[in-house]
Amino acid sequence: MPQQTIDLAYAARLPPKEAVAYFRAKGYNITWNWYEQLADAHARAFTVAKATRMDVLTTIREEVERAVSEGITREEFTRTLAPRLQKLGWWGKQIIVDAEGNAKEIELGSPRRLATIYNVNTRTAYGAGRYAQMMNTADLYPYWQYVAVMDGRTRPEHARLHNMVFQYDDIFWQTHYPPNGWNCRCRVRALSAARMKELGLQVSYGASFMNTREVDAGTDESTGEIFRTSSTTFDNGRVKMTPDVGWSYNPGSAAFGTDQALIRKLVEVRDAQLREQVVQTLNNSRERQLAFSLWLKRLAGSRQTGHEIRALGFMTGSVAEAVYQRTGNMPARLLVMNGKSLATTADAALKPEDLQRLPSLMAKPQAVLWDRENHQLLYVVATRDGTARIVVRTSQTVGRQNDRADVLVSISRVSAQSLEAAIADGMIDVLEGHVEVNK
C-alpha cells in the first residue's frame, strides 16, 4: 500500500482497511439534535441527527459503509440513498412530535443533508484510518504535519495551521487532528527526521499553549436544556486555532478502528516503547471514559443487557509479558465487560460514582496482581471514599482462545488486609504497584 496522505480522491481508488473497520465498529446512538452526539461519540457511535427510526439509521449506515469501502462518489451516494429514504418516509420537511410532545417543522432528508452526511462521515472515517496507519509507522515517521487545502473555501483558522509540524504524540493532536469542523478538508502528513531536515521544517509544541473550556453547543427547544461540550484552543502567540464546537477530539484515538483490530495491529509495531505510548494514550482518553458512561446510561434503561459488551481498556505490555512468563501463553490484551457481568457483580461492588469512572481507574490501578491458584489477573483500584478495594478479575482463561482478542472482567469488593495476607502467603504475586492498607 502506498505510504501517502489519504484524501477522498485517493481513497476512492484505494480505501484504507482501517477506515472500513472504523465504520463497522460503530454502534447506534440515536439523537434528536446533533449536539447531543458531539465529539466523543462521533468516533464511537454512528449517528445521524433526527434519525429516530432504526430502519432509517440502518439504511444510512449501510450506504455510508459502502461509500467508505467502495470509494463511491458523493453523487452516487445521494442517488442511491435518496430513494431508499423517501420510501421510508424520511425525506423533506415534516411536522415531528418529539419525546416531550412538542411539535415543530424540521427538515429530514434532502440532497444538502445527504451531502453533509457523506462529507462528515467519510472524512472522519478516513481520518481514523490514516491515524492508524501513521501510528503504526510513528517510529520511522514521528513528525506529523498539518496540511490545509489553501483555496478560497479554507477557513482562515485552519489555514493558519498549514505546514505546522508536531510530534505524533504531542498533546496538540488529541484535540486538533482533522477534521476540525463541518466539511473540513484538512489532513495530516507523516514525515521522517531526514525529510524534516530536507524541507527545513521546525517542530512546534502544544504543551503550555492548549486551553480547554466548556462552551454551549446548543439548546433543546422543547426543554430549554443547554448542551455543553469541551472546546480546546491552540494559541502559541503567533497562531491561534479553535476547532468548531463539538470537534475538539481525535477520531483516530477515539475509535482507532475496532478495538480488536487495534490489538492485532499493535503487535506489528516494532518499537516496544511506542506500543506502550499508544496503549497509555488510549487507556487515558476521555473518549473511552465517555463511551463507557454512555453505555452505562443506556443499559440502565434496558431490560436486555446480557450480550452487550464494552471495552474498558488495554492490558499493558509489561503486564502481558508477566502473564506470559507465568503461563507460557501470551494473553489477549483487550479488557471488556458485558451487561451480565455488570448486572451481577459491578452494581453490587461499586457505587454509581465509582462505576462511572471504571475505565479511568483501570488505566491507573493501585496494583496489578496475579492469582497463582486461579490463574487470574487482579486489577486493584480504590473506591472514592477509600473504605474498600475493588478487584477487577479477568476471566479464567487469560490465554488467547480461538484467536480471541478480548478478556472478560468481573468485579468484586475485598479488603486490602485480605489481599495483603494472600500476598504474604505466596498465593498472589505483585506484578505492578502495591496494595495500600488504611491505618
From Swiss-Prot:
The record's keywords, sorted A to Z, are: Host cytoplasm, Late protein, Viral capsid assembly, Viral release from host cell, Virion
Give the UniProt subcellular location, in the record's own words.
Virion; Host cytoplasm
- What factors induce this protein? Expressed in the late phase of the viral replicative cycle. Expression of late genes is activated by the viral late transcription activator C.
Coarse class of the protein's main subcellular location: virion
Pfam families annotated for this entry?
A: Phage_Mu_F
GO CC, sorted alphabetically, is:
host cell cytoplasm; virion component
What protein name applies here?
Putative capsid assembly protein F
